[in-house]
């Protein structure tokens, strides 16, 4: 069963530094920067453990000290409370 959509516009009002994804139906994006690759990879590891617990996984891209993240709930075809929960966790883990 799909979760109800809250929408990207509503989600970013509750988050710091997140934006509506360009060229995407309903998603939020953020780029995290760290001192080095080790910190970026540590962040990704912490987020991966939480994502597994939530059974909700980000689309992300990593180059050296930068992690670009896109969150959306595919079966809801947009942003849901799962995306908001994972985004808030990412902000606290960064």
UniProtKB/Swiss-Prot annotation:
Reaction equations catalysed: (4aS,6R)-4a-hydroxy-L-erythro-5,6,7,8-tetrahydrobiopterin = (6R)-L-erythro-6,7-dihydrobiopterin + H2O
Protein name (Swiss-Prot/TrEMBL): Putative pterin-4-alpha-carbinolamine dehydratase
Enzyme class, broadest EC rank: lyase
UniProt EC number: 4.2.1.96
UniProt keywords, alphabetically: Lyase
InterPro entries noted in UniProt: PCD_sf, Pterin_deHydtase
Record CDD domains: PCD_DCoH_subfamily_b
Protein family: Belongs to the pterin-4-alpha-carbinolamine dehydratase family.
Zinc as UniProt keyword: no
HAMAP family associated with the record: Pterin_4_alpha
One Gene Ontology term from the biological process aspect of the record: tetrahydrobiopterin biosynthetic process
GO function terms (MF aspect): 4-alpha-hydroxytetrahydrobiopterin dehydratase activity
Keyword Transcription regulation: no
Superkingdom assignment: Bacteria
